[in-house]
Amino acid sequence: MQKNSALWILRATDGCVSDLKYGSWTISSYEQEAATTLAAAGWSPITAAVLCSRGYDTPEKAQAFLSPDVPLSSPFALLDMEQAAARVKKALERREHICVFGDYDVDGITATCLLTDFLRKRGGHVTSYIPARLEEGYGLNEIAVRALHEQDVKLIITVDCGITANQEAALCRELGMELVITDHHECKSDLPEAVAVVDPHRKEQPEPILEMAGVGVAFKLAAALHGDQEALLAEYCDLLCLGTVADVMPLTGENRKMVWQGLQALANPKRVGIAALMAECGAMRPPITAGTIGYTLAPRINAAGRMGHVDIATELFLTNDAARAVSLASQLCKLNRKRQDVESGIYKQAVSMLPAGKSPKAIVLADETWHQGVVGIVASRLAEEYSCPTFLICLDGDKGKA
């Protein structure tokens, strides 16, 4: 990595850079002498200051931190990976109907597409399923489980969800279906009863915990079945990069390697869906950085789930038809423009509901016309603008959802 190109990846470690005019910011202290030494070694002064403030205060520490050339850990370092891989392998051998069940954000979509594509290329009879945000909500649910049972699905593999699906796991057993859970969210003390529960945050998981996105955990399952992680990374680093950056994972260790390789792949995309999306939204101009994902690609992919058309995004990443990909990319960008219009309308209405000339200590607003898939963005915007906790509630009869 060139030393003067390192700053973008440091910024991405903390997610998209916020507008500094809001809130109160405290700059971390650092040793000026150490920063001067790093600057003399070739880093820009601001990069040197950031590195020192994070404890990477020698050229050796800084280079080790920034280097994407790190070894990939064994997928079997994750608890229950052996059981998960064995059950999936059996399903492939028996030609059982498998469902990869994901989430409607970028991480969940890329995880779903990665594992679905991997299993189909190995002859799997695979259905992908992402719940409708407005009708089903987040994660594995009774409606979905029963629908999949009607389709004769024998094995459900969750990606980026499932770690709290205790009731749904019980329903799977009742219906004679088996469940493999892969997730990256925090675990409760009572895990769902499944064939395997693979999650870096399991309390019994040996240190160090892999802080990776749901797509990263899905990749580890594929790697356990494939055997050659480096070859698999070369094939799927584009999807890994999208999901990891969009989910604001720390860009350290394996995440840094995945994102670094992924950004190189995005500069010359081979997956027709990604190429079509980047062309449609004007993201092909170099340099391709984490900001390209955070500010340009991720909002458009997320729009599919927010606006209730997540199937457009999954088909886009799974299709091999270039003409179809162009059509899907166009649809996705139109959805994003619609999302922006809806968001703007809710924002203006919410601001008009606030008392003029006052600085609120908290904002709680509700309306029955607001779009549930978009209010979260508006709430975040208001919270940042007014520097206070903000709750926007979508009313539906006597119920409200935030």
Predicted regions and their residues:
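N-terminal amphipathic/basic leader segments beginning at the initiator methionine
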Residues: 1-31
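Hydrophobic helix-and-loop "lid/oligomerization" segment in the mid-to-C-terminal part
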Residues: 20, 28-155, 175-176, 226-402
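Generic beta-sheet signal
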Residues: 129, 159, 182-184, 198-200, ...
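Short gly/pro/ser/thr-enriched loop/turn and capping motifs at secondary-structure boundaries
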Residues: 134-136, 165, 185-190, 204-206, ...
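Short beta-alpha junctions and helix-cap segments that line functional grooves
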Residues: 141-144, 165-169, 182-185, 376-379
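Phosphate/diphosphate-binding loops
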Residues: 155, 159-173, 178
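Short, acidic/small-residue loops that bind anionic groups at enzyme active sites
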Residues: 177-192, 389-390, 394
